Each structure stands twice: as C-alpha cells, then as structure tokens.
C-alpha cells in the first residue's frame, strides 16, 4: 500500500485522514472509540486493540507481561472513571465520544506503574510473597 493511497477515498466518503507522523496532533492510544453496539463492547474491543498494539511493539513479550500491562491500563481507566461495567446497555457509563482531555495518556500510565512498583517495594518480604502468591 502506498502512502496516501486511500486519502482521496476517505475524504470523498466523509472520513478524516490522520497522518501518523504526529503532524496533525498527537494520537492517544488510550482514547476509547466507539467500536460496537454499546460501551461494554467498545471497551472490550479497545482493550483487545491495546493488547495487539503491545504485541506489535514488543513481539517477544510473554503473555504474563501483556496481561500485567492490560491490568495496569484497566486500573488507570478506573481512576479516570472510564469503565462502563453496567450489564444493562441502557444504563452504561458513557466512555466513548468524550473530549480528548477526558482520557489518560501514557505518561499517566507510567505514573501509575511507578506508584504500583513503589507500593510493592515498600512492603516487607513476607508481604511481597503474599502478593506474588495471590497474583499467580
């Protein structure tokens, strides 16, 4: 596929072309886009996209590493109140279509991960063993 090959078609169909070099602004991979009939489906598909993106960026990553990444992302979304969770599609929390500033960025994820590491390191070795045993 050549660069710009589909630009004219996307524009003709009312779409928007984003240059991935960042010249049109920053692409936030943590922004949750509508990708299904309801917010739960969009959230699940978004997490799947993040999982695939991680594996693309680090193909040698073990499944445990990818799972820890997703768990950290979900904890971050919890902080930002971006988890739909309601089983009733009519009462789900809106997590898509929000202003860009409503979504965390990777710097926020890094901050959270550093907090999690500090918390683990501050525990005594027996407490750390308990944490590790319950996670496995």
Language-model-derived ranges and their functions:
Residues 1-6:
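Conserved Walker A/P-loop ATP-binding site and its immediately adjacent core
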Residues 7-15, 20-22, 29-136:
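P-loop NTPase motor domains
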